[in-house]
């Protein structure tokens, strides 16, 4: 798995101060996508042990308290990314149980639940924003969403 960007301190992609990882690879190809550079699975850098350790270190940093981790992209829940992300998310939740996990995906919750691989990550997600970006439903006034078809699911209240 590759990633195109990592923000160790982010206040845009979720509530509170967070770490945000932009994962490479997306097959949805939404018209009007703001992050087309993340569509290729080869874009960016390999997500390696060093980057994994850096994110965990940042989440544990007491000088800059982070509320949690955001995974976006690209599409972090594309099956090609889950072989790496699922063990990483489990590790984050084990080592940082007080941190929340926000995930943006082009898949709907129903699609994720129907897929045997994708549904395995759902128990670790606190907030899921689902659905492809639909340019004809775009609304800049929406919080955390680009288009009105996207739904915010809060699986846990932290």
Swiss-Prot record:
The keyword Aminoacyl-tRNA synthetase does not apply. It is an enzyme of class 1 (oxidoreductase). [4Fe-4S] cluster binds at residues 26, 30, 33. This is Anaerobic ribonucleoside-triphosphate reductase-activating protein. CDD domains: Radical_SAM (cd01335). Forms a tetramer composed of two NrdD and two NrdG subunits. Keywords: 4Fe-4S, Cytoplasm, Iron, Iron-sulfur, Metal-binding, Oxidoreductase, S-adenosyl-L-methionine. It comes from the Bacteria. Its EC number is 1.97.1.-. Belongs to the organic radical-activating enzymes family. One of its GO terms (cellular component) is cytoplasm. Activation of anaerobic ribonucleoside-triphosphate reductase under anaerobic conditions by generation of an organic free radical, using S-adenosylmethionine and reduced flavodoxin as cosubstrates to produce 5'-deoxy-adenosine. InterPro entries: Aldolase_TIM, NrdG, Organic_radical-activating, Radical_activat_CS. Binds 1 [4Fe-4S] cluster. The cluster is coordinated with 3 cysteines and an exchangeable S-adenosyl-L-methionine.
